[in-house]
Amino acid sequence: MRFTEQLAAAWQRNNSLLCVGLDPDPARLPASLTTSGGAIFSFCRAIVDATADLVCAFKPQIAYFASQRAEDQLEQLIAYIHEAYPGIPVILDAKRGDIGSTAEHYAKEAFERYQADAVTVSPYMGFDSMQPYLVHPDKGVIVLCRTSNAGGSDVQFLETNGRPVYQVVAERARDAWNTSGQMGLVVGATFPQEIRRVREIVGDMPLLIPGIGVQGGDIEATVRAGRTADGTGMMINSSRAILYASSDSDFADAARGVAQATRDQINQYRN
């Protein structure tokens, strides 16, 4: 099944636009897990088990695994999600961007080694740096557009032919790059006006929207700006607010509580 089909099915099946980011910080893992090997996998698996019926996607951030030499645990985690919760897509948050020959290997890393359903990429080096991902027809390619960090404005608001760069990226994704319907865009919840503008440009293209929770993005403004006509079209990501809802042995139950409250708050504004 194609990534976009998986995502649409998950929106409906779980009545959810919530994406849970899996960013396991070793310094914040519960003490009950840190005394044994495989703590990162065990922590993330518990979060997945507690929230799988509440989400439309999971998004592991590769740096949190690679910095701990835990790439094998990332492979194990994605395989576990696919086996235990088939139909919930996994987005590898890698934000890759390099020349085509190198991008071919990054694509193999994401889609063959890790078996992710989608990957985040940077458009800064142009279409030929993204093309190697698009030759995997069932996979999603989610392009950075208007990111949630304040410093994104340094580049994304520079003007070219009277338009800010982030709008040009959205237009290119709509017109020239998305030839096989595999693309989505990253647009931060911290900038709802830009979410609305991107939605106007790209129509029903899926948007990955980080920035609610700890980063302070407003859920109501985000949903109203980014929803499509049928009340979907978004993967609204929350990571730290869910993962670290408790530092004790009840961390998974606490994560479920925050995830359910977030999912339900999002749903208030979908229609």
Swiss-Prot record:
PROSITE patterns: OMPDECASE (PS00156). It catalyses: orotidine 5'-phosphate + H(+) = UMP + CO2. The active site is at K95. The gene is pyrF. This is Orotidine 5'-phosphate decarboxylase. GO terms for molecular function: orotidine-5'-phosphate decarboxylase activity. InterPro entries: Aldolase_TIM (IPR013785), OMPdecase_AS (IPR018089), OMPdecase_type-2 (IPR011995), OMPdeCOase_dom (IPR001754), RibuloseP-bd_barrel (IPR011060). Disulfide bonds: none annotated. Keywords: Decarboxylase, Lyase, Pyrimidine biosynthesis. Pathway: Pyrimidine metabolism; UMP biosynthesis via de novo pathway; UMP from orotate: step 2/2. Coiled coil: none annotated. Its EC number is 4.1.1.23. One of its GO terms (biological process) is 'de novo' pyrimidine nucleobase biosynthetic process. Gene3D superfamilies: Aldolase class I. Belongs to the OMP decarboxylase family. Type 2 subfamily. It comes from the Bacteria. Pfam families: OMPdecase.
